[in-house]
Every structure is written in structure tokens, then in C-alpha cells.
């Protein structure tokens, strides 16, 4: 269940840090420290630098966030 007062933004993962923590650059240019949500941990979704992600931010601390979704890449490999 999503909380009402969270800010939802998109960005790109720039760096992978220990303990499922990542540094991401949001579309507005801000750098945030993010971690993976519990649902993504349970589903074993891998996040790599360069992936597009959707991040939830608290209005009280805009430097930390939670990755809630990994967006699909636009590039498709047709040479199966």
C-alpha cells in the first residue's frame, strides 16, 4: 500500500554500493542515495549501474530514497 505523502521520481543508477544501496541521478539532476524496496528483494530483481529506476522520496529528506521499480530498457536485442 503506497503512502500518500511520498514523492515519486525517475532516474538512472550511477553507482552500486554495498548492502543493496545505490547512488542514482534523478531526471532533475539531483543525486540521491537509494536502497531496494522489500518487494524487489523478495523477487530477486537485479539492479545494475545504468538501469532506469523509479524512486520514492520522503518530503522530509530529499537526499535518500527507495527504489520501487526498475524500468524496462528501450533497447531490444533482436539477434537471439
From Swiss-Prot:
Output the Gene Ontology terms for molecular function: ribosome binding; rRNA binding; translation initiation factor activity
Keywords, alphabetical: Chloroplast, Initiation factor, Plastid, Protein biosynthesis, RNA-binding, rRNA-binding
What is the species listed in this Swiss-Prot or TrEMBL entry?
Answer: Adiantum capillus-veneris (Maidenhair fern)
* Pfam families assigned to the protein according to its UniProt record, in alphabetical order: eIF-1a
UniProt xrefs under SUPFAM superfamilies: Nucleic acid-binding proteins
GO CC terms for this protein?
A: chloroplast; cytosol
Q: What is this protein called?
A: Translation initiation factor IF-1, chloroplastic
- Domain S1-like: residue ranges: 1-72
| Domain of life of the source | Eukaryota
Q: Where in the cell is it found?
A: Plastid, Chloroplast
Question: NCBIfam families this protein is in?
Answer: infA (TIGR00008)
How does this chain assemble? Component of the 30S ribosomal translation pre-initiation complex which assembles on the 30S ribosome in the order IF-2 and IF-3, IF-1 and N-formylmethionyl-tRNA(fMet); mRNA recruitment can occur at any time during PIC assembly.
> InterPro entries in the record, alphabetically?
NA-bd_OB-fold, RNA-binding_domain_S1_IF1, TIF_IF1
Give the family, as the similarity comment puts it: Belongs to the IF-1 family.
Reported function: One of the essential components for the initiation of protein synthesis. Stabilizes the binding of IF-2 and IF-3 on the 30S subunit to which N-formylmethionyl-tRNA(fMet) subsequently binds. Helps modulate mRNA selection, yielding the 30S pre-initiation complex (PIC). Upon addition of the 50S ribosomal subunit IF-1, IF-2 and IF-3 are released leaving the mature 70S translation initiation complex.
Amino acid at each position: 500500500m503506497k503512502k500518500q505523502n511520498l514523492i515519486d521520481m525517475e532516474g538512472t543508477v550511477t553507482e552500486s554500493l554495498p548492502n543493496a544501496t545505490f547512488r542514482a541521478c534523478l531526471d532533475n539532476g539531483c543525486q540521491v542515495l537509494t536502497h531496494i524496496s522489500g518487494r524487489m528483494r523478495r523477487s530477486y530483481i537485479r539492479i545494475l549501474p545504468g538501469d532506469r529506476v523509479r524512486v520514492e522520496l520522503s518530503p522530509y529528506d530529499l537526499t535518500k530514497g527507495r527504489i520501487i521499480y526498475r524500468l524496462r530498457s528501450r533497447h531490444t536485442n533482436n539477434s537471439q
